[in-house]
């Protein structure tokens, strides 16, 4: 099971793999959704509704089943992650960050996080010590990017 982060959707549709060019990628991701092999927490949808492109927002509305509510087990796991890694949160953001919840979903379902974030070690002067890949590594939760998902699924587009 893949737990999808907002950054994956943004890079997929808004930056690198737009739907008008990479139709087969949309079909492959749709197959994962239909099979129940991927999910995103409801906070990811809220982030997309706030910062996503109009095309991405439209796509999300057509895939409402992808988004899972913040069940108690996810909330408890996310609270534990946020307590251990407080800099995962952005205090300047007007929205609640989905990051800990994305990780919690993968942790609870023995899944893999799919995020386009890079680790703090890969950044020149990171403003914080922990990003999704850093927390995943420390917690033993697998974390890959969208290209990693494509390779893991052996997709040839």
Task: Set out the residue ranges of the language-model regions.
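Active-site neighborhoods of divalent-metal-dependent phosphate/nucleic-acid chemistry enzymes
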Residues: 70-134
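Short, well-structured N-terminal submotif of metal-dependent ribonuclease cores
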Residues: 1-40, 47-61
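Short internal beta-strands
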Residues: 39-42, 136
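Acidic, PIN/NYN-like endoribonuclease modules and their adjacent C-terminal/linker elements
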Residues: 22, 119-157
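PIN-domain endoribonuclease scaffold, especially VapC-family toxins
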Residues: 32, 42-96, 155
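Residue-level detector of structured alpha->beta connecting loops
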Residues: 37, 64, 107-110, 140
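Residues within well-ordered alpha-helices
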Residues: 55-56, 102, 132, 146
